[in-house]
Amino acid sequence: DSVTLDHDSLQILQGLTDMPRSPAVDWDSDTSIETTFYPAVEAAIKKAISRSHTVHIFRHGIRHSKNWPVPYNPPAMIAHLDQTGPAAVNRVLRHMGPVDGPRLLQGRYRIVHFWTPLNGPVYTCPVAIASSATVKDEDIRIFISHLGGVGGLGMPLGRPVAKPDPAEQYREDFGAPRYAEGQRWFYLSGISQDEAMLI
């Protein structure tokens, strides 16, 4: 069966052969990622979501279970929603500013994760996703409310910091779905570097 962002909150992109990879991108350098990888991600999102007018990438994170090339940041092992509805509104206001933020909230907006392997196919710890059309609101529980740093949990861009800047802190609510009959779950087996998921 096909899945779509509008129906399932999931879309699979294939044939991304022009995405920059190592050594063109230094995955240990935020500057390299932002200047080399971000434009390609923005272009891929605009192509996949044809009526998107603005794409703003507010952060990135690199998940892996080794200490190289970036600090230990293993995949999450529980099902979760990175943004609840109120947290999504706060994100838009925080990152888009006092003029554009409220204006964007008057129309349609989305927070979309662009997930792709960085070093070959993924065979361990694949990302599992439930179709949002099959998860009821009553099956979602708020499980963390906290003041996060730039990247949440006091960790800008997935890297630990000794002391987060209080000016950069804000409340962020996450959700956790409980399994229920009728939910449809997916994972992409062996997702490769020319594929990505919009979540």
Each predicted region: which residue ranges?
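Hydrophobic alpha-helical segments and helix pairs
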Residues: 43-99
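N-terminal auxiliary "cap/dimerization" subdomain that precedes the catalytic jelly-roll/cupin core
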Residues: 1-65
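Active-site environment of non-heme Fe oxygenases that use a 2-His-1-carboxylate facial triad
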Residues: 78, 83-192
